[in-house]
Regions:
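ATP-dependent carboxylate-amine ligase catalytic core
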Residues: 1-41, 49-76, 84-89
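Hydrophobic/aromatic ligand-binding patch that stacks against planar heteroaromatic rings
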Residues: 36-37, 94, 192
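Residue-level signal for short, function-critical loop segments
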Residues: 51, 81, 178-180
């Protein structure tokens, strides 16, 4: 699996969820949701929430998320866009009301914002001062997250790599658009094509 291959040889693996935690196919199923992925792989979930304009209500929402499916796999909470003062106020209350540990917070960092557009984020090559922004984010993560407790969530058996079959000889050629306009490609997709015996050929629709 992609997870087993990517996690092999590393101390921890991160799987990023998208959309709402339980939002899956068609928006009416939990299949292919972040929860479904965690349930399939047996992963602990660090739920990132933004406490904007709410406090005790946030505890109610978290309890709902934690009880909506059994098991929920939610193992901890991270408060995003949160001040140190707000974190100090909310964390004890949320832990008492939900039974879930609050593992830290990330403050607002306007100077580290990476913009977005109607089709998603800008690519790395388009972001000005990307390395400086990443450094600011890394410093904030190091300072404001309880790393010992977070890493304790990762203490599980490493995934077992499946037996890799011999790559069959190339049978088909798959053309993949790649240029300034067509630059959002998942390396894992190309790898899967090649593993299945396809030859990947790049071309530019602009030229």
């Amino acid at each position: 699996t992609l997870y087993a291959k990517g996690a092999a040889g590393h101390g921890a693996a991160v799987c990023e969820g998208a959309m709402g935690f339980y939002d899956g196919l068609g928006g009416v199923s939990d299949r292919a949701s972040a929860w479904h992925l965690a349930d399939t792989l047996g992963l602990p979930v660090l739920l990132v929430v933004e406490p904007k304009g709410q406090s005790l209500t946030l505890a109610a929402e978290l309890k709902g998320l934690d009880s909506f499916r059994t098991p929920s796999h939610i193992a901890g909470i991270l408060l995003n866009n949160c001040t140190a003062r707000m974190h100090a106020l909310l964390a004890p209350m949320l832990e008492e009301e939900t039974g879930l540990p609050v593992l830290g917070f990330l403050p607002k960092l306007p100077e580290a914002v990476i913009g977005s557009r109607h089709l998603g984020l800008y690519t790395a090559a388009e972001v000005e001062n990307l390395q400086q922004k990443l450094a600011l984010l890394a410093d904030a993560v190091e300072e404001h997250i309880d790393w010992p407790r977070l890493l304790a969530l990762c203490e599980k058996e490493p995934p077992v790599l499946p037996v890799q079959p011999e790559t069959p000889p190339a049978r088909v050629r798959i053309a993949v658009a790649q240029d300034e306009a067509f630059c959002f490609t998942y390396a894992e997709t190309l790898e899967a094509f090649r593993d299945a015996g396809a030859e990947v050929v790049f071309f530019s629709p602009l030229r």
